[in-house]
Amino acid sequence: MAIWQGRSLKKPSGGRIILARKKRKRELGREPANTKVGEDREKRKIIRTYGGNRKVRLVEALYANVFEGGKGKKVKILNVVENPANRQYARRNIITKGAIIETEIGKAIVTSRPGQDGVVNAVLIKEENA
């Protein structure tokens, strides 16, 4: 079933709202990309958006562009440590903006939106040894 992002057809009282027009294609939404940590390769999907433009969705991520002090480095993603968007996402290795990922050079926090941008950008987290 399609995801419709138009106005609700119910009033606050529970009564029906009768629309003066049909539903429009531009009001349709999509399922979330749910970018996972890939096993052997990266997988992207190109989708058509409003106005005939294109959006690149990252379905499986293998590498992340990790930045530290203005320098960037392409490193391999090992797994998802924590995800504040949904605690189940960490178990399922789903990457979203704000997720903490384990990389080859340490933990990093994701700053990009992989399902919207098609790339994983992250900033290295300073580890404090106590």
Swiss-Prot record:
GO terms for molecular function: structural constituent of ribosome. The keyword Ribosomal protein applies. One of its GO terms (biological process) is translation. PROSITE patterns: RIBOSOMAL_S8E (PS01193). InterPro entries: Ribosomal_eS8 (IPR001047), Ribosomal_eS8_CS (IPR018283), Ribosomal_protein_eS8_arc (IPR020919), Ribosomal_Se8/biogenesis_NSA2 (IPR022309). Keywords: Ribonucleoprotein, Ribosomal protein. GO terms for cellular component: cytosolic small ribosomal subunit. It comes from the Archaea. Pfam families: Ribosomal_S8e. Part of the 30S ribosomal subunit. Belongs to the eukaryotic ribosomal protein eS8 family. This is Small ribosomal subunit protein eS8. It comes from Thermococcus kodakarensis (strain ATCC BAA-918 / JCM 12380 / KOD1) (Pyrococcus kodakaraensis (strain KOD1)). The lineage of its organism: Archaea, Methanobacteriati, Methanobacteriota, Thermococci, Thermococcales. The gene is rps8e.
